[in-house]
């Protein structure tokens, strides 16, 4: 499930069901599916300042991870977000934004401390979480936001 490579428009993700490497677009409608077995893929992508606005355009819950490679707590959060992207592959899109390479997105969200996770739905910021959180806390937040989205529908 670990992204294998990325560019400005897509990331390569291994299918959790069959292991096939699939290119996952940063911005696409619908769900990313495995080209081989057609299982839902975790939607975990790297976005840039240029692709960010398209990346958050989805009806799914979006979890934006503002991070940097030198940040220890960011490295601790990364596997948790990967796991959540697998566990909620049909309802959650995780977007990773490297703050060192994408200053505009960082400024737009006033990211002064990282890791910083931003929950977004339909373009609206629902919650901002600053600092590394344990998996149970992040899972609760995802479930709370998904429940609120379901109740609003």
Annotate the PLM regions.
Residues 10-13, 31, 68:
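Residues immediately within or flanking Cys/His clusters that coordinate Zn2+
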Residues 15-18, 34-37:
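Short cysteine-rich clusters marking metal-coordination/redox-active sites
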Residues 22, 40-41, 78:
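Cys/His-rich microdomains that often coordinate metals
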Residues 24-32:
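Short linker/helix segments within small regulatory modules
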Residues 45-62:
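A short beta-strand-turn-helix
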Residues 47, 66, 77-104, 111:
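Thiol-based oxidoreductase modules, predominantly thioredoxin-like and allied folds used
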Residues 60, 67-70, 113:
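Short pre-active-site segment immediately N-terminal to redox-active cysteine/selenocysteine motifs
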Residues 113-152:
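Non-catalytic, surface beta->alpha helical segment in thiol-disulfide oxidoreductase systems
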